[in-house]
Amino acid sequence: MGVVYGSQQNLSEYFYSSVNMAEVPDTFEENRGHSFEGVTLQRRHVKGMKSYGSDITPRRPKQLGLPKEVNTSECIDQGSWRKPSAFESLRSYSRKFSKRIFSFIGVESKSTVQRNASGADSTSLSHFTANEINKGNCKKTALSNEFNSANKGSKASGVGAELPSVNGFIEGELHDDNETDSFRINELAKQIQETSLGATTQEDESSDGICWDELSTTSPESSKVSEPIIQDNTQTTHINNDSSDIRFSSRCDLFADDADSDWEQDFNVKFDSPLIIPETVNSAGHTVREQLFEVKEFTRSIKDLKDLYEKANSKDIYDKDSEILGEAKAILRLADPANYSDLKDEDAQNILSKYKVKLEGDSSLDFDASMLPGLNDHVHYLMSQLQLLLH
């Protein structure tokens, strides 16, 4: 079978059946090996086909060539030599139109940003955006008129059977593009106006880097805070004047304070900068801290001893005149300044002499800080003995 290869549309549908190459016309032999604008005719030797002893008469193909007026640059598909259809031409126009729209949007946004950066007011920006929108609408109407004229010309040329649907598609697309583009332009105008208004309000509210709103809101609070500071200073000076006689205050309020009060907090001072403390002061501070701890521990132990003493004194099975109960009673009197007048009994005198506590008259005791550890140990011993008696 001999096949003539040509363009995809014109020459592919012709074939030869049972062709004798000797009987091919001279025109085919002359054209063999020559090209028609890129299309080459080739020859292939195949066996002749017979049908029950009778040869089939050969057919001469139609001499079809490519039209010389076709411009290959106008064709959309590279492998096709046909003219572009009306839809393809309108599609190319629509692409050009969309490119113009996007280029217009980019120019408009750049110009508005530059005007905002230069400090243009909101009124000029609004006029500018309105003018740009009007220009864009004029351009869009001109382009739509151009599309309509192209559609009318294509209808008059005889290929208008396809155009109603294509024209409707293009008009709908243009309508949607117009709506979306106008919406985008309006949104850009709103954003520019908001940014310009925000910048002007910030410049009005603040001058020379000072925010007057913050000063107006914080100044009353600062004035309110300054008053308690002055009051605290007066209170501290008043307390210092009252606590000039440290010995007297320690005698009267040594055991009357609450047990939960953290007395050593006054000595836990935090200081960020490096501070050189003399060794004597440091050792004295440790000594005072230890003594305060002993006072706090003695106050807690006295409360527990008082509870155990009341339980043991309420029961008749134990001798109330025993040595343990007497010492516990003397320690409780020693811890309460209101009972200093009752320390003249034998048990109280024994404890005072044992721990070298001096009784000055009937109203005060001369306590030494060095005796607090011994008093704490004795209180713990009495508590253990009372627990044994109760159990």
Swiss-Prot record:
Transmembrane segments: none annotated. InterPro entries: Etd1 (IPR045342). It holds the Pfam family Etd1. GO terms for biological process: positive regulation of mitotic actomyosin contractile ring contraction; positive regulation of primary cell septum biogenesis; positive regulation of septation initiation signaling; regulation of mitotic cytokinesis; septation initiation signaling. One of its GO terms (cellular component) is cell division site. One of its GO terms (molecular function) is GTPase activator activity. Keywords: Cell cycle, Cell division. Residues 49-68 are annotated as: Disordered. Involved in septation. This is Septation protein etd1. The gene is etd1.
